[in-house]
């Protein structure tokens, strides 16, 4: 989770070098304890021009509706004007039935609270299952586990061959830097299956890789 300090440094860097920040906040409502600070909130707190930040939201994670393809962009009025013009020429129109469904889902917060509780329950299960694993950390938000392994690709292949559990090597989601590849020593596990299936999958991962 990006902290207030992280946002302040990034915004200061953007102001110094005159670039815009595009923030994907589709996971922002799936948190465990404390709501994370949003990019626009951070910009206001820093006294930054809201045109410096462009924020994207979606129903895909918030409401578990990835197939609906419904979202919105928030920024300053100049950016929004340009995005509207781009949409007019290059964007696909959203069918009216989808707009009506989206309107109802966006206006309802009860299911979002329930969604957070569901993931909290799964993370509690994960914390118990991986309690004895060194370097295991429980995330503050989202619905992914990043599990420490020696080699992400080898671990993912071993899991698939021996248990039928599919995970993603962390290196597939990271970019190497001078210190190496920060994702190579991890696998990413999505906690999106039903509770009992998730418990079974996590137990198989533990028994295959850590015992």
Which ranges hold each PLM region?
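PLP-dependent class I/II
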Residues: 1-211
